[in-house]
Amino acid sequence: MSAFWHKIGCCVVAKPPPKKKRRRIDRSMIGEPTNFVHLTHIGSGEMADGMQPSGPIKEQMRSKVPHANGRNSLL
């Protein structure tokens, strides 16, 4: 009978540790925007249609976005 329990024991895996709860962010943790510049307005309709900004709007936005790894990080 001990051989039976030995075989069963090798298949049982330990439970992974419980995941840490993510802290909820509330208004008191968020400060005022710094260096904010309103470039243009894109309505929810354009975003829902999946349209990409084009022409002057795209160039204006591209000139303001910080670059990461030599590429534009947002556009």
Swiss-Prot record:
Keyword presence, Cell membrane: yes
One GO term of the biological process aspect: regulation of Rho protein signal transduction
GO MF annotations in UniProt: small GTPase binding
Record-linked InterPro entries: CRIB_dom (IPR000095), CRIB_dom_sf (IPR036936), SPEC (IPR039056)
Biological function: Probably involved in the organization of the actin cytoskeleton by acting downstream of CDC42, inducing actin filament assembly.
Similarity remark: Belongs to the CDC42SE/SPEC family.
Protein name per its UniProtKB record: CDC42 small effector protein 1
Naturally occurring in which organism (per UniProt): Danio rerio
Upper classification of the organism: Eukaryota, Metazoa, Chordata, Craniata, Vertebrata
